[in-house]
Design a protein with these regions (language model features):
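Long, hydrophilic "mature protein body" segments
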Residues: 14, 241, 266-270
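Charge-dense polyanion-binding interfaces
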Residues: 259-275
Length: 275
């Protein structure tokens, strides 16, 4: 109840469910749901071509136990999760300097609904990138959240959390603001840059390319992915034009501590571009 419509109810043919994040099963376990228009036997046949022949029965049993628990107690459990998440939102917003996004963002069009169990917090107003707050929470307060990016952190409230965990998170954020806040005017203003696609990703990926220092790639066409992980959303993809703003964004993300993935050069000092 009081949650966004799920993928299958919205008419999806197939949907993956990360049970290890929200349902209480062990890490690496998830479910693949199939709708009435999909032949699940055929899907299983195709999956068997690539998946291991030595399935982990520890993971499978944890999925089954979690499935049963959600069937028996799921509505009550997620009701508590929503209450804890809304409480966390109120407390974090009362600190000042942070903004925990909520249902007030819904506008009926570009933001159709909002999942309150995802506690996303804007951090730039205290002069810290989300990844910096993420690192502080992990290293100084022993709190592991989902991820941090240039301007936000994401904490995933699940059925395994308690109100004491929420209090620890809120207290840590208040402490971080008091001890580590900086002048926000030094922060990069851009959160996301929409690149221009000029070549299909497939053609760009397989085309002849060369590696250039990142500062020399402005105006060239990228032939590889560049992304911060987590969350793993590409900053650049094959076939997209590299601009100065994108270069500045990548360098800024590196300086703030984002884990960069995708390029052939793991340090992202060079980027592969089409010849």
């Amino acid at each position: 109840k009081n949650m966004p419509v799920n993928a299958m109810a919205a008419g999806a043919d197939m949907a993956s469910v990360s049970m290890h994040k929200s349902g209480g099963s062990l890490t690496q376990s998830s479910l693949l749901l199939t709708g009435p228009n999909v032949n699940w036997e055929y899907v299983s046949q195709i999956i068997n071509l690539t998946q291991t022949t030595s399935a982990s029965y520890l993971l499978l049993s944890s999925l089954d136990i979690s499935r049963r628990n959600l069937y028996m107690r799921g509505e009550a459990s997620f009701g508590k999760v929503q209450d804890m998440a809304e409480y966390a939102r109120e407390e974090i917003n009362s600190i000042g300097g942070f903004y925990a996004y909520g249902r007030e963002l819904k506008n009926g069009s570009s933001i159709y609904d909002f999942d309150v169990t995802k506690l996303s917090v804007y951090t730039r107003d205290i002069g810290l990138a989300g990844i910096e707050v993420y690192d502080l929470l992990r290293d100084e307060y022993d709190i592991q959240i989902e991820f941090g990016d240039i301007a936000n952190i994401l904490a995933y409230i699940s059925i395994g959390d308690r109100i004491q965990d929420i209090e620890r998170l809120v207290g840590a954020l208040a402490d971080i603001k008091r001890l580590y806040s900086k002048d926000p005017s030094q922060m990069l203003n851009t959160e996301y840059i929409a690149p221009k696609v000029v070549v299909s990703p497939q053609k760009a990926f397989y085309a002849k390319d060369e590696s250039l220092p990142i500062r020399e790639t402005a105006g060239r066409i990228c032939s590889e992915f560049v992304m911060c992980y987590p969350p793993g959303i590409p900053i650049l993809a094959p076939g997209e034009v590299i601009t100065k703003d994108i270069i500045d964004y990548i360098i800024y993300a590196k300086e703030k501590g984002c884990s960069m993935q995708g390029p052939e050069d793991p340090d992202v000092n060079n980027i592969n571009v089409l010849v």
